[in-house]
């Protein structure tokens, strides 16, 4: 039976021949003799029997292992465990450095860890291996946008769209890049292409309204924000619509929408968060006027206390 916890086994013997030290010496001599006999029997020195055998996996076996590791890394990314995913993806590319999928997973993990330089290097390697994969161009553009380099992002997205012209998300990113370049008509065009490909793409429809508002087309912006809220009751279009309605004197609905929006996402009370979401100057100013209404004082103070947003690095 197994030893119980905290018990120390005792050696028992009745006479000197059973001394454990003597037994060990005799056992060692017996073992040495046996090895000598085996060595002579098999025609090799006994010492060879003590050399460990190291198994070296084949290239195919390493590739097979990398697939399982890469798949696990991708699953960890889906679960939001970017650091663990990066470690596994790095192992996968060491085992199989010629598969662009593992480099892509590694780049995504590095991007989520805000390691933009390493993510760019990993994507560059992936593109060397498979330059005709549109997703790699889009991913590199996403890194450029994160680094606030829209001039670099635009040609990368354009190249990706040559390979995958029906990618709604790519047109959305292109629209965001155009906003950052202050090319508002081009931004609107890109967002409209995104919703043409994917009509329920409410984020692109919301950004259409943001651009229209900055272009002075307030009525059309309001109409599109109402369409957005039929698709998704999100705090961003809700507060933007409230600000636009407040400018038109529709006080009751504006106050109600603003109250609901800030309860859903208090971060939108912060002008810097609005700016990071690519809100233009006009809609931010309209929102500031709305949030200055006495009826919203308590709601605004609560949102400011509950806001958790921090500027992306």
What residue ranges belong to the model's regions?
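Structural signature of tandem alpha-helical TPR/SEL1-like repeats
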Residues: 79-87, 112-125, 147-159, 180-193, ...
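Canonical tetratricopeptide repeat
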Residues: 71, 105, 139, 173, ...
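Position-specific recognition of the canonical hydrophobic site in helix A of tetratricopeptide repeat
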Residues: 77, 104, 111, 138, ...
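Terminal, low-structured helical/coil segments at or just beyond the last alpha-helical repeat
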Residues: 51-57, 260-313
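Helix-start (N-cap) detector for alpha-helical repeat units in TPR-like alpha-solenoids
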Residues: 65-66, 100-101, 134-135, 168-169, ...
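TPR/TPR-like (Sel1-like) alpha-helical repeat modules
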Residues: 226-235, 239-270, 295
């Amino acid at each position: 039976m197994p030893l119980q916890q905290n018990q120390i086994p005792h050696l028992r013997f009745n006479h000197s021949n059973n001394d454990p030290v003597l037994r060990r010496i005799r056992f060692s001599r017996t073992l040495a003799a046996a090895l000598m006999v085996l060595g002579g029997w098999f025609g090799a020195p006994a010492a060879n029997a003590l050399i460990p055998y190291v198994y070296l996996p084949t290239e195919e076996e390493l590739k097979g292992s990398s697939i399982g590791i890469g798949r696990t890394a991708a699953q960890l990314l889906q679960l939001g465990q970017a650091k663990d995913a990066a470690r596994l993806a790095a192992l996968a590319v060491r085992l199989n450095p010629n598969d662009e999928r593992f480099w892509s997973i590694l780049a995504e993990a590095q991007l989520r860890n805000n390691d933009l330089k390493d993510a760019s290097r990993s994507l560059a390697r992936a593109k060397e291996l498979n330059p005709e994969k549109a997703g790699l161009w889009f991913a590199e553009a996403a890194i450029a946008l994160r680094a606030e380099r829209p001039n670099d992002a635009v040609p990368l997205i354009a190249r990706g769209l040559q390979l995958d012209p029906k990618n709604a998300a790519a047109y959305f990113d292109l629209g965001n890049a155009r906003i950052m370049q202050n090319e508002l008509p081009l931004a609107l065009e890109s967002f409209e292409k995104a919703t043409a490909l994917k009509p329920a793409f409410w984020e692109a429809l919301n950004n259409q309204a943001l651009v229209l508002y900055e272009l002075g087309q307030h009525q059309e912006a309001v109409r599109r924000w109402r369409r957005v809220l039929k698709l998704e009751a999100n705090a961003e279009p809700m507060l933007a619509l409230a600000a636009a309605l407040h400018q038109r004197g529709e006080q009751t609905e504006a106050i109600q929408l603003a109250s609901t929006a800030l309860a859903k996402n208090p971060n939108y009370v912060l002008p810097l968060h609005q700016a990071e979401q690519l809100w233009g100057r006009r809609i931010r100013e309209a929102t500031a006027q709305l949030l200055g209404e006495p009826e919203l004082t308590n709601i605004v103070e609560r949102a400011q206390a509950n806001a958790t947003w921090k500027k992306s690095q």
